[in-house]
Swiss-Prot record:
Annotated residues for binding of substrate: 153
Upper lineage: Bacteria, Bacillati, Actinomycetota, Actinomycetes, Mycobacteriales
Origin species: Mycobacterium tuberculosis (strain CDC 1551 / Oshkosh)
Name the UniProt record assigns to this protein: Uncharacterized oxidoreductase MT2820
Pfam families: adh_short_C2
Residues binding NAD(+): 12-34, 39-40, 77-78, 104, 174, 203-205
Amino acid sequence: MIDRPLEGKVAFITGAARGLGRAHAVRLAADGANIIAVDICEQIASVPYPLSTADDLAATVELVEDAGGGIVARQGDVRDRASLSVALQAGLDEFGRLDIVVANAGIAMMQAGDDGWRDVIDVNLTGVFHTVQVAIPTLIEQGTGGSIVLISSAAGLVGIGSSDPGSLGYAAAKHGVVGLMRAYANHLAPQNIRVNSVHPCGVDTPMINNEFFQQWLTTADMDAPHNLGNALPVELVQPTDIANAVAWLASEEARYVTGVTLPVDAGFVNKR
């Protein structure tokens, strides 16, 4: 096994300041990649739990460097394609190429009403679209292929959630990511660019570990234990579990894997 299978590669990761995005950045850096990290680092009004901060992004920079990777980190909003383009270009200016895209940025909506629907669609679906769109020209121009990984959710494969517009929007967005993945996988295959999606169950991150999410579990109009229980005896998986899957999809070990929905969910989807 190669110790640093992504040596010389460059990965563009959104939502990289903490949680899953940080785990992806650190794991890919440990595997040899340089990182272009983007995160909004400010609050969205309809999101009830605290989002990332500039200090969180700075901590990711330190962790990536400790793992042996170079990193360019910028604040940017996936809802704003221009800000993503600026962030990506800063990384390209530094590292000279792009090989891996991880469209990870996302928010969880609980009882946020119609504003929640709009914001979760804008971040979790349109933001993924923007991320891929700004990266495609460079990947194609280089002519060396690439790997695009879209972070969806177990909620993108089965129908779960409450009847609140924010929760419905989350399910709709995560299902929509699957459609994007499948279409991109076909469109980009001739350029040897692979596109896949990863579908976590609940992950031990600030998105889940906050008082607002726990309150939502107790008040949502659904059978929470039935709908949110995993098959394997674990309540929450770790960010590194998801990052391991992303690292594999980014590597040559998955060189002929494209168009795949990959659950990393402790059997959550299969139990439905």
